[in-house]
Amino acid sequence: MEELQGYLEKDRSRQQHFLYPLLFQEYIYALAHNHGLNGSIFYEPVEVFGYDNKSSLVLVKRLITRIYQQNFLISLVNDSNQNRFVGYNHNNFFFSHFHSQMISESFAIIVEIPFSLRLVSYFEEKEIPKYHNLRSIHSIFPFLEDKLSHLNYVSDILIPHPIHMEILVQILQCWIQDVPFLHLLRFFLHEYHNLNSLLITQKKSIYVFSKENKRLFRFLYNSYVFEWEFLLVFIRKQFSYLRLTSYGTFLERTHFYEKIEHLQIKDFVVVCRNYFHRTLWFCKDPFMHYVRYQGKAILASKGTHLLMKKWKYHFFNFWQYYFHVWSQPYRIHINQLSNYSFYFLGYLSSLLLHFSAVRNQMLENSFLINTITKKFDTIVPVIFLIGSLAKAKFCTVSGHPISKPIWTDLSDSDILNRFGRICRNLSHYHSGSSKKQGLYRIKYILRLSCARTLARKHKSTVRTFLRRLGSGLLEEFFTEEEQVLSLIFPKTTPFFLHGSHRERIWYLDIIRINDLVNHS
C-alpha cells in the first residue's frame, strides 16, 4: 500500500502549472499550422483544407488577432451553428472550420508539453541511449516473434469507446493543475460538438478513431488508456507479494470523482473493493504478454482457455466500475494461436506450425522422431489494402485501377511525387512481410492509377502516354525497395537482393501507422 501511495505521490509531484498563458503565444499556432501541413503521410493538406501555403499563413495571423478578442470561442461556436443549420456562407464556414482546427491542434501541443518533458527525463534517469528507436511501430513485431511462439491463446481486444469527455478532462487533472486551462478545455469540448473535425454525440461522448479525428482527441484517448493500463500493470506486477486487501488503495484516487457526492463515492469504493477481492486471485500467470496500439490490444498467455475467460470477465468489470464504460462481449475474442490469424498494425499475423521428421539410428534399431516448430509469420493483407485504395478512389472494390481526377490540376512532377510517396511508404511500412507478392500487386494498382491520372490530364490513353514518355517514367514504383535495402546492407555479392522478396526487415524509424492501413 505504501509503495503504491508513494508512486502516485511521485506522479502528482510532476504536475505542470501555468499552461493557460501558452494559448496566447503566437508560436503555438505557428506550430499547429506547421503540423497541419506536414502531419499526414498519405493525404495532402491542400486537399483536406482547401487552401495553399501562402494564404494559410495569413489565416493563422488573423486567428492570432482574434484570439485576443473577448468571447472569441463563443462567437466561433455560434457562427458554426448558424453556418451548419441555417444555410451557411461558404467562406464563413471555412474560416470557422480552419480556426477550430488550429485551436484544437494548439490545445494538443500545449497538453503534450508536460508529458514530453516527463518522457525525456525518464529516459535520462534510466540512462537509455537512442530512446527514439523504442518509438518505432516495427519494434513490436520482433517482440511478438520472440514471445508468441511459446504461448497458447490470444485475446483480440477492442478497447471500448466512446468515452464521456468529462472523464477525459478529469484524467488530465491528475497531471495538470492549471485550473483555467482545464476549464477552457472543458468548455472547448462541450461547445465544439457541431463541427466535422470533432465528432461528439448528444451525450457528449467522443468517438476517437473516426476518419476526421485530430491530434487532441488522440491525446485525450491515450490518457484514458494509460490510466487503466497503469492499474492493470501494477496489479500484474504486485500480485506475488501484496495482500488482497491492499488493492483497495487503487480507489483512493477519488480526486478522479471530486464532483460526485460523498455517498456515491463511498458506495463506489465499496463495490470496487469487493470486485477486486473476487477477481484478483487468478492473476498468477507468469507467461502473460500485453501489446496495444491505437484502439486495439492483444493479450497472449500460455495458460488455459478458462484463464483467458477470467481475464475477459475482469476487463468488462474493470471498464464498467472504474470508467463507467459499457463494453459488449464481441469486443474481446479468445482464440488458439495455432489456428488463428489476427489483424494487427496493418499485418495479418499468425503462428505457423512446421512438422519435420528426423531418423535416429541406435545400434541395429532406427526410428523416426517427429518435431514441431512454431514460427511467427506476418503477411500483407491485400484485401484490406485494396479496400483502402478503393475508399481513396485509386481503384474499384475489385482492385481495378482508376484515375484520380482531383489530382489532374497538379503538375506532372507533383502527381508522380504523390504516387511515389505512397508507394515508398507502403514498401517501407510492409517491409516485414514474409510474402511480398501481395505488396507488388498493390504497387501495380498505384502505378497504373498514376498512369491513368497522367493520361487523363493530357487527354490521352494510357498506352499512348507510356509509349511517348517511356516505361522508365514509373520505374521508381518497383525499384525503391531494392535501393533502400542496398543502402542498409551494402551489396557484397551480385545475388544479395535476389531473394529480397522473402526477407523480413523491421525498421526503427516508423513512428506512426500508415494512413492506408488506418482506412482498412
UniProtKB/Swiss-Prot annotation:
UniProt xrefs under InterPro entries: Domain_X, Maturase_MatK, Maturase_MatK_N
Record-annotated membrane-spanning stretches: none
Any one Pfam family match given in the protein's UniProt record, by short name: MatK_N
Record-stated family: Belongs to the intron maturase 2 family. MatK subfamily.
Example of a GO MF term: RNA binding
Subcellular location: Plastid, Chloroplast
The keyword tRNA processing is annotated on this UniProt entry: yes
Main location: plastid
Domain of life of the native organism: Eukaryota
Function recorded in the entry: Usually encoded in the trnK tRNA gene intron. Probably assists in splicing its own and other chloroplast group II introns.
Assigned GO CC terms: chloroplast
Protein name from the UniProt record: Maturase K
Keywords, comma-separated and alphabetical: Chloroplast, mRNA processing, Plastid, RNA-binding, tRNA processing
GO biological processes: mRNA processing; RNA splicing; tRNA processing
Species this protein is from: Aspidistra elatior (Cast-iron plant)
